[in-house]
From Swiss-Prot:
Name this polypeptide is given: Methylmalonyl-CoA decarboxylase subunit alpha
Domain CoA carboxyltransferase C-terminal: 267-503
PROSITE patterns: COA_CT_CTER (PS50989), COA_CT_NTER (PS50980)
Keywords: Cell membrane, Ion transport, Membrane, Sodium, Sodium transport, Translocase, Transport
MF terms in GO: propionyl-CoA carboxylase activity
Activity regulation (UniProt): Completely inhibited by avidin.
Annotated GO biological process: sodium ion transport
Family, as annotated: Belongs to the AccD/PCCB family.
Function: Carboxyltransferase subunit of the sodium ion pump methylmalonyl-CoA decarboxylase, which converts the chemical energy of a decarboxylation reaction into an electrochemical gradient of Na(+) ions across the cytoplasmic membrane, thereby creating a sodium ion motive force that is used for ATP synthesis. The alpha subunit catalyzes the Na(+)-independent carboxyltransfer from methylmalonyl-CoA to the prosthetic biotin group located on the gamma subunit. Can also convert malonyl-CoA into acetyl-CoA.
Length: 509
C-alpha cells in the first residue's frame, strides 16, 4: 500500500506529464513558429500566479482507429480561471502540441464547462484557438462538441463579454465559435481562419491562394471584417486583450470600471475651433476630434482596418467608458456604405448590451451611391443602423460637427432615433440634402437662381434651423465639446427607458 508521500509524488508526476503537453520536440516546434504554448499564453494573459487550471486529468473515451492507445495530456486544451487587473476572467487555450489541438468530445466538454462557469459567475471568457480542427477519429462526437460550444456562445451573448483569440489555424466548423463571440483577435503571419482551406479551394474551383491571403490576420481585418483586431505578435495580442477588458464590465448587470484618468473634465481644447476647413467640402481627420475630447487623448479603435469611412472605438470621458461611433471625412467623405453600416450596428448593439454609453460624432453627407451598393443591399444594411440606435436604451449623445444630410443624418443617431442629447457645432449643416443641391432644385427655373441659391446656402447651411425646431439641444463652440459630453453623461447616469415587452425584435440581417 502506497504511503501518503508516495501518493503526493504520484500527483506531482501526473501534473508534470500534463504540463509537458505534447513533449519537448513539439514545444520546440511551436516556439520555432513564433508561437507560445497554451500554458505560456495563459500565464501572460492573467495576473501573476492567479490562474487556476481545471480538469487537468480529463481523458478522451475514443477506442477507434488506435485512439485507445494514445494519451493526450489535458485532452489538448487548458481551461481555468484567474484574474486580469484583479477581476475574475475565465479562459481556455487549445494546445497545438497535443494532437494538433484537435477537438474531440472531452476537449469540447472542458470548454463547455468553463463557458457555463463564466455564465454562473458573471465573468468574461477568453478563448485562445490554435487547432487543426475536429478530431476525425471521434467522428460525430467531435461535431456534437462543436455544437455544444456554439450553443453556449449564443446563450452567453449579451450577458458576459466573449473574446476569441486566433493564435494558429482555425478551420472548418471551428470558425463559428469565434464568429459568435463579441471580438476576435488575430496575430499577423501566424493566425488563419477559413471554412475551406487553400487545397480544397484549388481542387474545387481551381483558384490558387495561400493560407495567409485566404484567411490571415489582415484578410479578416481589412477585407472580410470577420476579425476586429490585428496584433504584431502574441505578446502584443495578449496586452491588447488585457487593455480591452479594462473598458468593459464583467457582465450585463454591471457597469464598466470607473478609472481615475487625471484629465480635467472641464478642459477645453482650443485646437478644435480651428480644425475644420472653411470649405465644407474639404476633408479633415475625425480622429483629431476624438483625441482632443476624450480623456488624455486615449482611445482603442475596433476594426481600424475595415470600413475606415466610419470609426468605432472605446474611450473614456471623466473616467467613464464609452463607445464612440464617428464618420471619417478623410475616407469617402464619411459616406455610409454597406460595410460601415454593419460595422457600426454591431458595435452599437455590443455597447447597449453591456451598459456602455454611446457618443456619436457626425459628419455624413449621405449613403454611398452606386449599383454595387444598391444591389449589395444597402437598404437592408443601412436599416441595421436605424434599428440598432432605436433599440439601444443606453445614454446616447450626438455631436454634429459638420454635414448631417438626409437619411444618413437619421442613421447616425438623430434625436428622432433616440439621441438623449444632440450638440451641434456652428459649422453644422443639418438638412434633407446639401444646401447647394437643394437650392438648385428649389430655384431651378428662377431667373435670379444664383443669388437665391447663395442666400439659401447662407441661411440653411447652419445648425440654427434645426435648433429652432428643437432637433438640436445646444449649439456649442467646438472647444466646448469635452465638458459638454461629460455634463451630458452625468445627467444621463440615472436614465431608465422601458420598451414594449417582446421575445426579441427582428433586426434586418
Amino acid at each position: 500500500m502506497a504511503t501518503v508521500q508516495e501518493k503526493i509524488e504520484l500527483l506531482h508526476e501526473k501534473l508534470a506529464k500534463v504540463k509537458a503537453g505534447g513533449g519537448e520536440k513539439r514545444v520546440e516546434k511551436q516556439h520555432a513558429q513564433g508561437k507560445m504554448t497554451a500554458r505560456e499564453r495563459l500565464a501572460k494573459l492573467f495576473d501573476d500566479n492567479s490562474f487556476v487550471e481545471l480538469d487537468q486529468f480529463v481523458k478522451h473515451r475514443c477506442v477507434n482507429f488506435g485512439q485507445e492507445k494514445k494519451e493526450l495530456p489535458g485532452e489538448g486544451v487548458v481551461t481555468g480561471y484567474g484574474t486580469i487587473d484583479g477581476r475574475l476572467v475565465y479562459a481556455f487555450a487549445q494546445d497545438f502540441t497535443v494532437e494538433g489541438g484537435s477537438l474531440g468530445e472531452m476537449h469540447a466538454a472542458k470548454i463547455v464547462k468553463v463557458q457555463r462557469l463564466a455564465m454562473k459567475m458573471g465573468a468574461p471568457i477568453v478563448g485562445i484557438n490554435d487547432s487543426g480542427g475536429a478530431r476525425i477519429q471521434e467522428a460525430v462526437d467531435a461535431l456534437a462538441g462543436y455544437g455544444k460550444i456554439f450553443f453556449e456562445n449564443t446563450n452567453a451573448s449579451g450577458v458576459i463579454p466573449q473574446i476569441s483569440v486566433i493564435m494558429g489555424p482555425c478551420a472548418g466548423g471551428a470558425v463559428y465559435s469565434p464568429a459568435l463571440t463579441d471580438f476576435i483577435y488575430m496575430v499577423k503571419n501566424t493566425s488563419q481562419m477559413f471554412i475551406t482551406g487553400p487545397a480544397v479551394i484549388k481542387s474545387v474551383t481551381g483558384e490558387e491562394v495561400t493560407a495567409e491571403d485566404l484567411g490571415g490576420a489582415m484578410a479578416h481585418n481589412s477585407v472580410s471584417g470577420v476579425a476586429h483586431f490585428a496584433a504584431e505578435n502574441e505578446d502584443d495580442c495578449i496586452a491588447q486583450i488585457r487593455y480591452l477588458l479594462g473598458f468593459l464590465p464583467s457582465n450585463n448587470m454591471e457597469d464598466a470600471p470607473l478609472v481615475d484618468t487625471g484629465d480635467d473634465p472641464t478642459r477645453e481644447d482650443e485646437s478644435l475651433n480651428s480644425l475644420l476647413p472653411d470649405n465644407s467640402n474639404m476633408p479633415y481627420d475625425m480622429k483629431d476630434v476624438i483625441a482632443a475630447t476624450v480623456d488624455n487623448g486615449e482611445y482603442y479603435e475596433v476594426q481600424p482596418f475595415y470600413a475606415t469611412n466610419i470609426i468605432t472605438c472605446f474611450a473614456r470621458f471623466d473616467g467613464q467608458s464609452v463607445g464612440i461611433i464617428a464618420n471619417q471625412p478623410k475616407v469617402m467623405a464619411g459616406c455610409l456604405d454597406i460595410n460601415a453600416s454593419d460595422k457600426s450596428s454591431r458595435f452599437i448593439r455590443f455597447c447597449d448590451a453591456f451598459n456602455i454609453p454611446i457618443v456619436n460624432f457626425v459628419d455624413v453627407p449621405g449613403f454611398l451611391p452606386g449599383t454595387n451598393q444598391e444591389w449589395g443591399g444597402i437598404i437592408r444594411h443601412g436599416a441595421k443602423m436605424l434599428y440598432a440606435y432605436s433599440e439601444a436604451t443606453v445614454p446616447k449623445i450626438t455631436v454634429i460637427t459638420r454635414k448631417a444630410y438626409g437619411g444618413s443624418y437619421l442613421a447616425m443617431c438623430s434625436q428622432d432615433l433616440g439621441a438623449d442629447q444632440v450638440y451641434a457645432w456652428p459649422t453644422s449643416e443639418i438638412a434633407v440634402m446639401g444646401p447647394a443641391g437643394a437650392a438648385n432644385i428649389i430655384f431651378k427655373k428662377d431667373e435670379d437662381k444664383d443669388a437665391k441659391t447663395a442666400k439659401y446656402v447662407e441661411e440653411f447651411a447652419t445648425p440654427y434651423k434645426a435648433a429652432e425646431r428643437g432637433f438640436v439641444d445646444v449649439v456649442i463652440e467646438p472647444k466646448q465639446t469635452r465638458p459638454a459630453v461629460i455634463n451630458a453623461l452625468a445627467m444621463l447616469a440615472s436614465k431608465r427607458e422601458n420598451r414594449a415587452p417582446k421575445k426579441h425584435g427582428n433586426i434586418p440581417l
